[in-house]
């Protein structure tokens, strides 16, 4: 079938802050306590979306959940009206409260795992909400994400939206950031590759459990290949596979140290897709790869043909990394263009261009079935930019998250977004 891959980017929320909540995420830890700029962050994300729209690519967005996460705090025993719930949590358990203020849902690659219709057992696109069970602040996201995905992809003739797996370490699931699809073209059957973070029973935590990938594949009725991310990459700070590898159609771009069983993975991909192309980079170390987020780039098929890497501007600031980019572009592979974007506010919390988007391949009828409010055109994009300019805070000090004025401003921003979505 003819298929379109849509990038649904997370709209960065008004509570974007640097509270340093994610152990193993070097950027998050390094910038803990810094001043964030929610307005600039959201506009940077929207500018990235516009760059791809201008190239003829279909672009969607996922609205942020309200933060602080009142429903989660209420479920943990803080009573009263919303303001009282927030105030009590801030006073009685500041660490929990900071986790409830996280805007980490911006990283839509962790929202769900998407199984394309040609790969699924029933011919529908399956979206399995990620439980994000390993990190407290991220575990609060799943209920809102499930509800939002059910709104965007409500037509059950074409889409099956699944709730999150049980929120335990045994099924810890961080979504599409640990899933790749190798296929001749987006509309054809492909190989779903699930990358897990540690062998069962090892001393390392399974931020992405193998059992989670197995369950996701069962839910969608998909054949799958499961492989282990290299421990060297994890210890260097690659807390998700998409920090060291990215795939698009028949091409896999990866650091040479990304996988424990590189040969087995490449052999499986080659059996599934005979024209499989592996582009490996061994000219830079894992430290450069992770600090620049070279592999956390979007790899896209352009309407006019060829593929482009959508790279964070940090890749251009490191001469070794940029030399690697030039080598990729000059190589015997379909990647022939680099699109450099500024997503610095997200990068400082550990999320590059690929983290910010959820890829959803759809056929023509399924595309028409998506709620159009969440597909961007010029008018909707301009309306979102104006909304952010008007309502998103200019700056947030992570030490001041307990300020009631900040909660009120964030609530007003979400109210304005709800109003916009009701009319566009």
Curated annotation (Swiss-Prot):
It catalyses: N(2)-succinyl-L-arginine + 2 H2O + 2 H(+) = N(2)-succinyl-L-ornithine + 2 NH4(+) + CO2. Substrate binds at residues 19-28, 110, 137-138, 207, 242, 349. It holds the Pfam family AstB. Pathway: Amino-acid degradation; L-arginine degradation via AST pathway; L-glutamate and succinate from L-arginine: step 2/5. GO terms for molecular function: N-succinylarginine dihydrolase activity. Its EC number is 3.5.3.23. The active site is at 174, 240, 355 (nucleophile). It comes from the Bacteria. One of its GO terms (biological process) is arginine catabolic process to succinate. Keywords: Arginine metabolism, Hydrolase. It is an enzyme of class 3 (hydrolase). Catalyzes the hydrolysis of N(2)-succinylarginine into N(2)-succinylornithine, ammonia and CO(2). Belongs to the succinylarginine dihydrolase family. HAMAP family: AstB. NCBIfam families: PRK13281.1. Homodimer. This is N-succinylarginine dihydrolase.
């Amino acid at each position: 079938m003819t298929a379109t891959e849509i990038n649904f980017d997370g709209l960065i929320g008004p509570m974007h802050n640097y509270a340093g909540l994610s152990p193993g995420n070097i950027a998050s830890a390094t910038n803990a306590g810094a001043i964030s700029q929610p307005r600039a962050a959201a506009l940077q994300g929207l500018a990235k979306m516009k760059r791809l729209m201008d190239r003829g690519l279909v672009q969607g967005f996922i609205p942020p959940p309200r933060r602080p996460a009142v429903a989660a705090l209420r479920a943990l025993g803080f009573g009263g009206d919303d303001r009282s719930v927030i105030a009590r949590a801030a006073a009685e358990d500041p660490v929990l409260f900071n986790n409830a203020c996280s805007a980490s849902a911006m990283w839509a690659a962790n929202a769900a795992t998407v199984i394309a219709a040609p790969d699924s057992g029933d011919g529908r696109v399956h979206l399995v909400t990620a439980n994000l069970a390993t990190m407290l602040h991220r575990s609060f996201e799943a209920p809102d994400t499930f509800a939002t995905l059910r709104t965007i992809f409500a037509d059950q003739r074409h889409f099956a939206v699944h709730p999150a797996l049980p929120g335990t370490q045994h099924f810890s699931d961080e979504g599409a950031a640990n899933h790749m699809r190798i296929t001749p073209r987006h509309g054809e059957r492909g190989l779903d590759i699930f990358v897990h973070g540690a062998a069962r029973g090892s001393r390392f935590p399974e931020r992405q459990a193998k059992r989670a990938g197995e369950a996701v594949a069962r839910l969608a009725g998909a054949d799958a290949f499961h492989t282990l991310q290299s421990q060297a990459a994890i210890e260097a700070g690659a807390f998700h596979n998409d920090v060291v590898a990215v795939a698009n159609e028949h091409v896999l771009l990866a650091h040479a140290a990304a996988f424990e069983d590189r040969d087995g993975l490449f052999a499986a991909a080659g059996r599934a897709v005979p024209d499989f192309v592996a582009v490996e980079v061994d000219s830079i170390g894992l430290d450069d790869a992770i600090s620049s987020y070279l592999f956390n780039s979007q790899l896209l098929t352009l309407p006019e043909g060829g593929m482009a890497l959508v790279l964070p501007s940090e890749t251009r600031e490191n001469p070794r990394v940029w030399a690697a980019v030039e080598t990729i572009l000059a190589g015997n592979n379909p990647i022939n263009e680099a699109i450099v974007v500024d997503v610095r506010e997200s990068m400082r919390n550990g999320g590059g261009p690929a983290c910010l988007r959820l890829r959803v391949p759809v056929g023509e009828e399924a595309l028409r079935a998506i709620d159009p409010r969440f597909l961007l055109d010029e008018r909707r994009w301009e309306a979102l930019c104006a909304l952010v300019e008007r309502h998103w805070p200019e700056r947030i000090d992570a030490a001041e998250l307990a300020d009631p004025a900040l909660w009120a401003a964030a609530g007003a921003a979400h109210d304005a977004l709800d109003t916009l979505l009701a009319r566009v």
